[in-house]
Structures are given as C-alpha cells and as structure tokens.
From Swiss-Prot:
Pfam family, one: PGI
Reaction equations catalysed: alpha-D-glucose 6-phosphate = beta-D-fructose 6-phosphate
Gene label: pgi
Pathway given in the UniProt record: Carbohydrate biosynthesis; gluconeogenesis; Carbohydrate degradation; glycolysis; D-glyceraldehyde 3-phosphate and glycerone phosphate from D-glucose: step 2/4
First-tier enzyme category under EC: isomerase
Lineage: Bacteria, Pseudomonadati, Pseudomonadota, Gammaproteobacteria, Legionellales
Compartments in which it is found: Cytoplasm
Entry keyword set: Cytoplasm, Gluconeogenesis, Glycolysis, Isomerase
InterPro entries for this protein: G6P_Isomerase, Phosphoglucose_isomerase_CS, SIS_dom_sf, SIS_PGI_1, SIS_PGI_2
PANTHER family linked to this entry: GLUCOSE-6-PHOSPHATE ISOMERASE
One annotated GO molecular function: monosaccharide binding
GO biological process: gluconeogenesis; glucose 6-phosphate metabolic process; glycolytic process
Protein's name in the database: Glucose-6-phosphate isomerase
Length: 499
C-alpha cells in the first residue's frame, strides 16, 4: 500500500518562492527573449575541460538560480552527492550503494562496502580488460581453429547494449579498423540473422553481458550463438561473459567471465567491463582516457560550488522547467553523426532512473518527476519534427549538443540558426501562418572534440544531472520496480497460458 506523503518537497520555503517567480515569468511569457530580465548580471556559460555549457537561452535569472540553489541546499544535495561517491547505501530499496563512480576512479583511495575495499576488485578487473583487449588487438587471442579474431559481437540489452553502441559509433576516429563490430540486443530473429550473415564464427568473439545473467533476450541470443559451434570445447575462445553472477555463466558453458557488481546499476555500467568491446576497439590506453573524462566530472560535481557546477546547474534548471514552468519533455538534439546513439542512451538513463511517482518514503509524490526524453540527430529534425517545435502546441525544453571542430562548421551553423528561431521566434512577418512564438528554453553543450575523454565526461555529466534531479524529487534513481513488477506479471501470464 502506498503511504500518504509525510512532508512534500512542495512545502519547502524555496519551492514556494520559486513558484512565485514562475508566476511572474508566465505573466511576461510574450517576451522575445528566453532569458528573464534581471538587474543582476550573471555569467550564463560554464566550462569543464572539454565541455562548455551555455544556458543563456533558458528562462532564468540570478534570482531564480539563487532560489534553485537554496532548494538544493534545503534537500541537502551536497551531502547526497558525497554519499553517492563515498559508497553510502543510497539505493535504499535494494539496500546497497550505487558506485558507478568507483569504476572510473583512477586514484589510490579506498572505498569500503561492508568492511571490504572494493577498489582492489575494480583494479583487478581493469587489468583483465587490459590483458584481453591487448591479446585480441595483437592477434594473440585465437579461436578454436587457431585463427585470430576478426569480429566482435556484443550480446546484451539496455545498459549492456546502449553504452557500448554509443562508444563504437562516437569513437569512429579511434577504433581499430582491423575488426568488425556488431550488436545483438533484440529477440527478433532478423536482428540475429543479419549479424550472423556477416561473420565467420571461427574468427568471432561473442561478449555476453547481463548483470543477472537471467535476461531472457540476452540468453536466447547467446544460446543461438552457441549453436554455431560443434561442441562446448570449441566455444571456449569464442565467448566472454560479463555478469554479477559468474556461476550462471559457468553453468552455461562460458569459462572466461569478467565481473560487474550488484552496486553498479545496469544503466550506469558505462565504465565497467560491459564496455569491453570498446576497450578492444580503441585500445586499453584510450579506454582509460574514457574513464578519466568521467572521473574528472565526478570530481567536478563533488567539489565545485553549485553556482559553477555544470551537472548541478543543468539539473536545477531542468527542475525549474519541469516543475515550475510545467514543461515536461526534454528534446536532445546532437549535431554530429558520431553522437547518433547518445539520445537513446540518455533516454534510457533518464526515464528508467527518474520515471517514478513514489518517493523514497513509499509515498505518492504530488509533483512532476522525470520528463519524457526524446530527440535524435539535429540535422534530421529539420525534415521531421522541426515544424512542431516551431508552431506546435506542445512545449519543449532543448539540449543542443555540438562539436567545436573545423569539419562541423556547416552543421553547427544549422544548429545556431535553429536555436535562434526557437528561442527568439519570428514575430515581424506579414504572413500570419509564418508566425513562430519562440520562447523555447534550451541548453547548448559545446564539446571540444569527440575523443574518449570527452565522451566519458559527457556521459558522466548526464549521469550526475539525473542523480541531482532525483534528490530534488526525493526518489530513488537506482531501482526499477515498475519493470520488475511488469516482468512478474508477464511470468504469471505465461505460466497461466501454459497450464
């Protein structure tokens, strides 16, 4: 039974002051500019190494930013960030930490869980990733027939698929062209057959990733891949499992197993052995750069004051749009083909984490939580949903992501034009059908490049933004009870239909 809320966050002083500011903003909704006028000038652009964050087109001013930071302080955000990174059991429904940040901690500090230092296991696993990736890249990992590996197939779904897929696509300038990279995540036979038609099983390595090693889709595809080989002896050099339950992988017949741990959520496993295919593709040294980019954002979010803290500002401005301006969907547009899979990755990360209506006390919330996340390649939006953005009745918030490189000049120009039109509108046109109201709040993230370091930083930035918002909403971003409940119902229906 869901309990009534003890004290809602809507009763906080800062929340009520923000509501009054939102009422004032709505009275001035015809303003041509997204930024609310304010006598106190403030810097609306922040930088962390390889990423510049520009929120000058958001409907905020210094007063609103200060109140949002007051809200963060009222809910003890700094303490919650420290608890996350220091390994406190913040995943309260499962009574465990959420220590994905430990996976990319390249320092020498100890992180204790129930009296055990987990960093020794993390470092040991990194060493295994290094050895395996080097052996494959140096043609020393041979298949059963004695031939070197030419194709790597990643079998997984959700976080075990989307993160690696983002990397292989985004880091195309870094990956070895001596290998072919494939992904199977779907139970649709066509997906499996399309990949199998392109490979030689004798020179193929399958990476089977499943935290529980009970994921139906993943195990079905793994068994179909097993059937490509004559017997269990011939599969030893062709399969690697990544799981928190190695005994299940061994039982299935896979002898080489890399661990993931119950304190790492599947959708937060980007920096784990789940991304082994990326370490093989770009080499271990560049894989460490990926970890370093994420780790530097971890340090930034923990030790930077909130006024200059990019993930915190992104989260708080997102709260402002979602809970006070009542804009409940987030459009993410990436202006580089390399980032084609970034939007589905964030879509899962955000909506599975914060798509909750029950708070950490087991009470129904009385405010909006996670937004609907959608989007894709920005240059394709012109010919699909740009019309709705210009003149539709649904309001959106936008994250526009561009690369600051010479070969992206033309596509970046298209991005700037769209941001200008959507934020400022077109009001001085004689044809009334051409009227565009504008006033779309938006962020602009400018990446210095699309390197492993920058990609790691970008992923960590969104991870922390999502966590910060969960703190404000008082929900647990590290479980998925709705999914588990639906799975149980599906099993019951299946058993009932079979009886």
């Amino acid at each position: 039974m869901i309990r009534n809320s003890m004290k809602s966050h809507t009763e906080l002083l800062s929340w009520n002051l923000l509501q009054k500011e939102a009422d004032r903003v709505r009275l001035n909704s015809d303003s041509l500019t997204c930024v609310v006028p304010d006598s106190n000038n403030y810097e609306s652009s922040k930088q962390i190494n390889c990423i510049e964050y520009d929120y000058s087109r958001q409907r905020v001013n210094r007063t609103i930013i200060d109140l949002l930071i007051d809200l963060a302080n009222e809910v003890k955000l700094q303490e919650k960030i420290d608890n996350l990174i220091n390994g406190k059991k913040i995943n309260i429904s499962e009574n465990r930490p959420a220590l994905h940040t430990a996976l990319r901690d390249l320092g020498n500090k100890s992180i204790m869980i129930d009296g055990l230092d987990i960093m020794s296991a993390v470092i040991n696993t990194r060493e295994k990733i290094k050895v395996i990736s080097n052996q494959i890249r140096e043609k020393k990992w041979l298949g059963h027939s004695g031939l070197p590996i030419t194709d790597i197939v990643n079998i997984g779904i959700g976080g075990s698929d989307l993160g690696p897929r983002v990397c292989i696509n985004a880091l195309s300038n870094y990956i070895s062209k001596e290998f072919n990279y494939h992904f199977i995540s779907d139970v649709d036979p066509a997906s499996f057959n399309d990949v199998i038609a392109k490979i030689n099983p004798q020179t193929t390595l399958f990476i089977v990733s499943s935290k529980s090693f009970t994921t139906k889709e993943t195990l079905l595809n793994a068994r179909k891949a097993f059937a490509l080989y004559e017997d269990t002896a011939s599969i030893d050099q062709h399969f690697i499992a990544v799981t928190a339950h190695p005994e299940r992988a061994y039982q299935m017949g896979i002898k080489t197993v890399l661990p993931i741990w119950d304190w790492v959520g599947g959708r937060f496993s980007f920096c784990s052995a789940v991304n082994l295919i990326t370490a093989i593709a770009i080499g271990y040294e560049q894989f460490v750069e990926l970890l370093a980019g994420a780790h530097d954002v971890d340090t930034h979010v923990q030790f930077t004051d909130f006024k200059n803290n990019i993930p915190v500002l992104m989260a708080l401005i997102g709260i402002w749009n979602n809970n006070f301006l009542n804009i409940h969907n987030l459009l993410i547009l990436t202006y580089s083909k390399k980032l084609e899979y970034f939007v589905p990755y964030v879509q899962q990360l955000d909506m599975e984490s914060n798509g909750k209506s029950i708070d950490v006390n087991g009470s129904m919330v009385d405010y909006a939580t996670g937004p609907i996340v959608w989007g894709g390649l920005g240059n394709q939006a012109q010919h699909s949903y740009f019309q709705l953005l210009c003149q539709g009745t649904h309001r959106c918030v936008g994250d526009f992501i561009t690369l600051k490189t010479n070969d992206e000049h033309e596509i970046n120009s298209m991005c700037h034009y769209k941001m200008k039109v959507l934020s400022e509108g077109i009001q001085t046109i004689e044809n009334p059908y051409g009227y565009i109201p504008g006033n779309m709040p938006m962020n602009h993230l400018i990446l210095s490049d699309c390197s492993p370091y920058t990609l790691g930083a970008l992923v960590a930035l969104y991870e922390h933004k999502i966590f910060v918002q969960s703190v404000i909403w008082n929900i647990n971003p590290f479980d998925q009870p709705g999914i588990e409940s639906a799975k149980s119902a599906h099993r019951e229906i299946t058993l009932s239909s079979e009886s």
